């Protein structure tokens, strides 16, 4: 086990003492050592209400091989050895003597686990207080810090009773759980937008669900975590509308210029406002939906309000879904504008009674994963006031990069046949309300047909519809600070979405952080080896509470999880830069790779059907030596590595080839070859319900990325796809003459990948990708000019 920690601060001793007193500990350096140890260790069992109960708890802790903590305290000690203190500390942190560590040498385990410690014996009360302060900020076996663990057991439950008025509590630069999340005020409002996406002549009203600390009713104003979540009110069965992968790749007769595919913002409609008949300070509707994001729940107990809004076309709101269109961005912005006092909302949909977010400080962070993170990124690119930061996990920065690639229809990994129209149906939760649907069904079906037409599955080309869903175009407008989190094995929302957005905001005068993990499309807030919750606590305390805690400097710019060394996260200045830390090597495919042939015929669709494969089994087989697809691919290998190497950046392919057809699909996979136990792409559960989000509150599982039980022969590092009629970009077309050589350039997905010595790099070049592209029936023959082809690989040195 490794408990990496990036968010721990080390303030000077006076600040440490003041903070210890602020959380209710007896922390006077002038007290005797004996009295201080008794007071402090007794305080560490808040679940024990009497001295007798506390003494029993103390008797369960071993100081060394000879005595318990209760017996040791009874001797009124005047000092404590470093070893004895950390024997006690480890048990308080949830580790077991004899099982997890040796009482004769706790430091061996602490070093391996990356736990901090003082380097000397405790010979004074000041030493003790320093050790206790460090202990409170040390991570437990249960992922959270020790102070969080104490608070989860009731240590801070009476904090507000001792204050003249409700307030936030900060410790070590981070806000603490001194609010009872169980008592949160739950309410619903309807925010008036500027849009009419369902074409009924009225401004769409957008439902927003609010959970705010009860202390706001006593005058406390709080910042807001806002999650724009299209799934919040449920999803629909999309089996009937999911596309069957087409069997013919169209020959494109014409392309377009950049100007022709550039979308121009539409002029806002001049719509009448909903009538106003009064104002209220209390909502009329209870929020019946439960919060569905543990990250938000964690901060609700720390004095942040949490707001969810599903947006246009969802249950209890007006409008139609647009799958990432400007209307969905505007819907998220409308919620922020209400939270900052710049837009009206109503207590119900009909009476015209307005309500303000009077409890809000007007400081907002957007959070969430996938579609939720996508809308956070989209809102940030508007430059809306009040949005201080986004914490965007696996978000889409351009919808073309989600459903298309280089002139091809390319489904997100794991969702073959999905497209923008399918997702629109999936999230159109208005249809769950029959009384609502009967009034809009015909208009919705007409609207959906427009999405199906405009997404253009026939050519897969980039057009104005996709351009309107490219948020990177407006990245220069971003004013909010940005945290991006992404899985390096996320083939659903591929890593290019994060890295291209990261590059687009690189020169902006904002703070920005990037976290890259070895998972697929998953959260990392409950991954034990990373202190992600503390990192974001430090960040949000700075961003939303205005605390000068140095978060922008303390937190690394880039944190990357290693794919070989278990539970290892490394800090870097940037991704794929600066130049002094990176080098690129261009490898010729003929002289630097071994290949049995330079040609293949793509029989993948026939093989897929004959093998009764699935998308998942195909993805395994296409990168496995000697699989059923061996004749439908080109397999190129390099010699085994003599030393460890780390790829970091965007692999780039230059390829000269000829095909025997006027159109074709080319897919490329970069492979780590060699039998090994590699990390699973989904973190495994290590403690069911082990992460507590607040005192007597919700829990979630603690997870960890682990090597698989069985070795595998290969692992996908990166991949890319291209329609060979689009060698330059996704909108210009180049005619293919069968049998005549032509050249293409192809960027693969960004990666950070540690290759151990002894492994081999392999390059797999093939045609149709059964898991993601369409599945042509017609076979195509590919002839690769290896001597005039190369791949450029970026390395961190």
UniProtKB/Swiss-Prot annotation:
Protein's cellular compartments: Cytoplasm
Keywords on record: Aminopeptidase, Cytoplasm, Hydrolase, Protease, Serine protease
Lineage top rank: taxon: Bacteria
GO cellular component: cytoplasm
Molecular function (Gene Ontology), one example: aminopeptidase activity
A Gene Ontology BP annotation from the UniProt entry: proteolysis
Catalytic activity: Hydrolyzes Xaa-Pro-|- bonds to release unblocked, N-terminal dipeptides from substrates including Ala-Pro-|-p-nitroanilide and (sequentially) Tyr-Pro-|-Phe-Pro-|-Gly-Pro-|-Ile
EC number, as in UniProt: 3.4.14.11
Active site positions: 370 (charge relay system), 490 (charge relay system), 521 (charge relay system)
Top-rank EC class of the record's enzyme: hydrolase
Similarity comment: family membership: Belongs to the peptidase S15 family.
Function of the protein: Removes N-terminal dipeptides sequentially from polypeptides having unsubstituted N-termini provided that the penultimate residue is proline.
Assembly and binders: Homodimer.
Protein name: Xaa-Pro dipeptidyl-peptidase
Source species: Lacticaseibacillus paracasei (strain ATCC 334 / BCRC 17002 / CCUG 31169 / CIP 107868 / KCTC 3260 / NRRL B-441)
Taxonomic lineage of the native organism: Bacteria, Bacillati, Bacillota, Bacilli, Lactobacillales
């Amino acid at each position: 086990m490794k408990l990496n920690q990036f968010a721990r601060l080390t303030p000077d001793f006076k600040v440490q003492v003041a903070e210890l007193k602020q959380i209710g500990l007896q922390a006077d350096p002038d007290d005797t050592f004996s009295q201080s140890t008794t007071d402090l260790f007794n305080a560490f069992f808040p679940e024990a209400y009497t001295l007798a109960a506390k003494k029993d708890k103390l008797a369960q802790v071993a100081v060394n091989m000879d005595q318990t903590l209760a017996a040791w305290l009874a001797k009124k000690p005047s000092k404590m050895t470093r070893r004895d203190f950390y024997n006690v500390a480890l048990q308080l942190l949830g580790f077991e003597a004899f099982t997890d560590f040796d009482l004769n040498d706790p430091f061996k385990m602490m070093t391996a686990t990356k736990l901090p410690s003082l380097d000397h014996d405790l010979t004074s009360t000041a030493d003790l207080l320093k050790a206790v302060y460090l202990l409170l900020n040390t991570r437990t076996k249960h992922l959270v810090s020790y102070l969080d663990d104490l608070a989860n057991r009731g240590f801070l439950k009476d904090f507000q009773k001792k204050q003249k008025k409700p307030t936030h509590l900060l410790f070590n630069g981070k806000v603490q759980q001194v609010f009872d999340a169980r008592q949160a005020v739950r309410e619903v409002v309807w925010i008036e937008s500027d849009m009419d996406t369902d074409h009924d002549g009225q401004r769409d009203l957008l439902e927003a669900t609010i959970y705010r600390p009860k202390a706001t009713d006593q005058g406390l104003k709080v910042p807001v975590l806002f999650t724009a979540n299209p799934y919040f009110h449920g999803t629909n069965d999309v089996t009937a509308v999911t596309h069957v992968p087409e069997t013919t790749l169209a020959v494109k007769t014409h392309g377009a210029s950049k100007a022709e595919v550039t979308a121009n913002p539409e002029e806002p409609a001049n719509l009448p406002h909903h009538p106003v008949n009064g104002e209220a300070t209390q909502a009329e509707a209870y929020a019946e939906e439960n919060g569905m994001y543990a990250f938000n729940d964690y901060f609700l107990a720390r004095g942040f309000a949490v707001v969810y809004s599903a947006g246009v076309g969802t249950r209890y709101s007006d409008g139609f879904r647009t799958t990432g269109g400007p209307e969905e961005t505007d819907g998220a912005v409308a919620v922020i504008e209400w939270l900052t006092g710049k837009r009206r909302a109503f207590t119900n949909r009909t009476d015209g009674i307005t309500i303000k977010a009077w409890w809000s400080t007007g400081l907002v962070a957007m959070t969430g994963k996938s579609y939720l993170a996508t809308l956070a990124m989209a809102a940030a690119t508007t430059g809306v006031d009040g949005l201080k930061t986004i914490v965007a996990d696996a978000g889409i920065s351009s919808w073309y990069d989600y459903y298309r690639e280089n002139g091809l229809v390319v489904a997100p990994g794991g969702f073959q046949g999905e497209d923008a129209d399918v997702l629109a149906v999936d999230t159109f939760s208005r249809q769950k309300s029959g009384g609502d649907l009967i009034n809009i069904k015909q208009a919705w079906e007409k609207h959906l047909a427009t999405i199906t037409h405009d997404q253009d599955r026939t050519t897969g080309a980039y057009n104005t519809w996709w351009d309107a869903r490219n948020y990177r175009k407006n990245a220069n407008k971003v004013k909010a600070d940005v945290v991006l989190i992404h899985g390096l094995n996320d083939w659903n929302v591929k890593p290019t979405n994060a890295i291209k957005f990261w590059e687009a905001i690189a020169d902006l005068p904002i703070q920005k952080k990037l976290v890259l993990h070895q998972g697929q499309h998953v959260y990392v807030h409950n991954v034990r080896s990373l202190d992600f919750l503390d990192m974001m606590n430090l960040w949000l305390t700075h961003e939303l509470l205005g605390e000068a805690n140095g978060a922008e400097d303390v937190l690394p710019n880039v944190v990357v999880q290693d794919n070989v060394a278990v539970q290892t996260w490394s800090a870097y200045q940037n991704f794929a830069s600066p130049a002094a830390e990176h080098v690129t090597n261009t490898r010729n495919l003929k002289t630097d790779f071994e290949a049995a042939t330079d040609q293949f015929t793509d029989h993948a669709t026939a093989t897929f059907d004959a093998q009764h494969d699935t998308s998942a089994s195909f993805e395994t087989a296409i990168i496995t030596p000697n699989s059923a697809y061996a004749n439908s691919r080109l397999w190129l290998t390099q010699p085994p590595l003599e030393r460890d190497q780390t790829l970091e950046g965007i692999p780039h392919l230059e390829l000269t080839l000829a095909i025997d057809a006027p159109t074709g699909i080319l897919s490329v996979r970069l492979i780590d070859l060699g039998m090994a136990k590699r990390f699973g792409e989904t973190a495994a559960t290590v403690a069911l319900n082990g992460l507590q989000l607040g005192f007597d509150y919700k829990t979630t599982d603690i997870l960890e990325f682990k090597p698989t039980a069985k070795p595998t022969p290969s692992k996908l590092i990166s991949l890319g796809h291209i329609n060979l009629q689009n060698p330059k970009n996704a909108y210009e077309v180049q005619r293919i003459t069968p049998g005549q050589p032509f050249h293409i350039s192809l960027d693969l997905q960004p990666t950070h990948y540690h290759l151990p010595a002894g492994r081999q790099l392999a390059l797999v070049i093939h045609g149709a990708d059964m898991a993601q592209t369409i599945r042509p029936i017609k076979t195509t023959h590919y002839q690769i000019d290896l001597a005039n082809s190369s791949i450029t690989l970026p390395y961190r040195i």
